[in-house]
């Protein structure tokens, strides 16, 4: 399953940047930049709280050794004294398999099967008991958080050319695959036995925090963790198709101010100044589709308020998101101090069980499995977007007509710019470099 021999020495920050390693959990932040921090704890995010996705759990079983090598490298680079691996407590076999491999300064943190257990603010609070300040980063509380796959990529010590992801939902055989970056999502659906509905829509990244795919030709990127395939008529797809104006108009007329959206908000429960019900309330006093409620900047966009908490099926999350640019412009920022933040006394009791969330989303009828399997034959064509990471797009270093081998550098960030290198995921000929490097075998 895409294994490699053990590297002779831990990788340096320059080596990690050279390999093109970025946050594989969705953020895409360059790993070499993150690991330049000095902290006491490195936390491995293996919570994987998005419904129906199994990628991280499968990697903890099949790529445990490279992941632990990556963790050791991350701890050495940051000066961390402790490593903590967050895993859902229900995965007892995964934890049992990991335990014998752990060094004395690394421990497993069993996590509740709730959503969003994988939010790094919640994970840090669970792991070390400290609350990241609003707008802050884990390093502000002496920690670094890295995804399982990110650390495995560091431990494998080779250019990042493949992405692990789960294909789930309305497919014949849900599966987790290692796909060459740039593979079309349509090819992955075919590898999962094909769609189990005539007309489908695909959520890229997950049911809660994903986005609708524009077409089945969209490529796999370094940050894509899963595909949720659903019938086009599924209620969840209808929710994702709503326009900002529809969201604001309906929210303005139908919100009953029950404040369930705030009472269950994960960030509110750790003391952050985000109260989605106030954002909804402010819609009633404005003709704009955006809200002026202070605190919307600190919405983590987990979508729990919109897709679970609200009894009226309104969309507080997108109301908060729509207001963020105006809130930044007006500098509606948190003015508190770190020691003024405290978790809600009922925070632990208000966590949402994943099983209940799956039922509310209308996903209970789909198989909740995703075994790791080989993709099979490599695609004949890949599309490598120049922007699949945090920071500026990479600049191509190849031209149409160039022949490349898998692992060759095809794009790189400008000197001094935040970005990541991109490597060929298949061998072939470069056909174009406009916005993406297209390679055909």
Pin down the residues of each PLM region.
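Flanking helices and flexible, charged tails adjoining ferredoxin-like Fe-S electron-transfer domains
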Residues: 2-9, 20, 25, 51-53, ...
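Short, compositionally biased
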Residues: 209, 244-250, 417-434
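Histidine-anchored nucleotide/phosphate-binding helix
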Residues: 42, 61-78
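Hydrophobic alpha-helical positions that pack around
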Residues: 81-187, 191-198, 206-208
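Ferredoxin-type iron-sulfur electron-transfer modules in oxidoreductases and energy-metabolism complexes
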Residues: 230-252, 260-263, 267-343, 379
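Gly-rich Lys/Arg/Thr-decorated short loops/hinges at beta-loop-alpha junctions or inter-strand turns
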Residues: 43-56, 171
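Short, well-structured beta-strand-loop connectors
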Residues: 263-265, 399-412
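Short, Lys/Arg- and Gly-enriched loop/turn segments at beta-strand edges
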Residues: 235-239, 411-425
